[in-house]
Amino acid sequence: MSVKWERDSDAPKGTLTFDIDTETIQKGIDHAFTRTQKRISVPGFRKGHVPRTIFNQMYGEESLYQDALNDVLPDAYEAAIKEAGIEPVDQPQVNVESMEKGQPWTLTATVAVKPEVTLGDYKGMEVPEQDTSVSDADVDSELENKRQQQAELVLKEDEAAADGDTVVIDYEGSVDGEKFDGGSADNYSLVLGSGSFIPGFEDQLVGHKAGEDVDVNVTFPEDYHAKDLAGKDALFKVKIHEVKEKQLPELDDEFAKDVDEDVETLAELKDKVKKQLQDQKEAAAKAAIEDAAIEAAVANAETEEIPQAMLDDDTNRQLQQYLAGMQQQGINPQMYFQITNTTEDDLRKQFADDAAKRVKTNLVLEAVVKDANLNATDEDVQNEIADLAKQYGMDEEAVSKALTRDMLEHDIEIKKAVDLIADSAKQTAKAADKD
């Protein structure tokens, strides 16, 4: 196969010229005739049985060329781009330059390819200093969260409701004496001070006891989501059925055992909480260092203009992953759009706004892979398969079938590039001051 690649000097695209040999062409013509023969009728012959010579006399072999080209072009194009060593990022625009009988066919394809990257410094990036220390106050705060989670609601028999208490109420609202949709409920549990209701509602229940009827006068905010109620005064008739207060458990060994069956004392729980917080801070610090170092490396690099096809592919991929994630969590995307008053196009635009940054980042990481000669070994691939199988609850054979080796190697090499950039980064207070 004769292949010639001429890259444009001012954009990530070029012209690929390639030939299709006569043997391949003849096979394509033969297949085209077989398909055509089945659907044509010629006087004197049964449908589907016209001889090749008669067909050629009546229609000419050239009538099969376009069908034959459609048959052989995909494989010929794939072979040509492989020989040229290019990575197309969009469907090519193919033109036939010559299609003569008995001669190789010559074609040209206008091909958009990955932009070239000129790397700057990517090792030793200055990143904000990360604080991974865990204080006693951090531990105390986490223990207090656990106390809140273990709290019980206890009835206040003859005591007034206070901020933080839970009241069980019936309420019915009206504006100018008229009831409105969503303005009433029975046996509703409301935490006073939570800000769940419109401003002023919860405050007016503080100081009242179970069994009391309370008139609550409020004004809907000007920016209230129901436009017909925005800015209007409303009266709510409220009946208080119960008042409950939160009782927190004592911070002692019994509490520790209730919270975590693997510990026996409060001291052990504190140590375990401190270790968990330490792990969380170190993981967050690692992620922050990676993000900052990669961002700096990307800023130091230069790329050609990114083809629109790459931006569109990235946007579509992000959108589909997001929608798939919704469905995995049991969320109906159409219901989500209805509730949030958005559309799929709104979501697509959000992803499109950051597509250039994501694509450039990936291009730079791929360039680092080449520059640093980072390769995925057989052991790397096997470990990646094992990790993915564990992560998704699949067997390793299923993972191997779902992902090609090229995909696995690419992901591994990108991770190695990320590690190389992040591990060589320098944490400095100066970088933190810049932020």
UniProtKB/Swiss-Prot annotation:
SUPFAM superfamilies: FKBP-like, Triger factor/SurA peptide-binding domain-like, Trigger factor ribosome-binding domain. One of its GO terms (molecular function) is ribosome binding. Residues 164-249 form the PPIase FKBP-type domain. It comes from the Bacteria. It is an enzyme of class 5 (isomerase). PROSITE patterns: FKBP_PPIASE. Keywords: Cell cycle, Cell division, Chaperone, Cytoplasm, Isomerase, Rotamase. Residues 125-147 are annotated as: Disordered. Pfam families: FKBP_C, Trigger_C, Trigger_N. One of its GO terms (biological process) is protein transport. It catalyses: [protein]-peptidylproline (omega=180) = [protein]-peptidylproline (omega=0). Involved in protein export. Acts as a chaperone by maintaining the newly synthesized protein in an open conformation. Functions as a peptidyl-prolyl cis-trans isomerase. Consists of 3 domains; the N-terminus binds the ribosome, the middle domain has PPIase activity, while the C-terminus has intrinsic chaperone activity on its own. NCBIfam families: tig. Belongs to the FKBP-type PPIase family. Tig subfamily. This is Trigger factor. The lineage of its organism: Bacteria, Bacillati, Bacillota, Bacilli, Lactobacillales. The gene is tig.
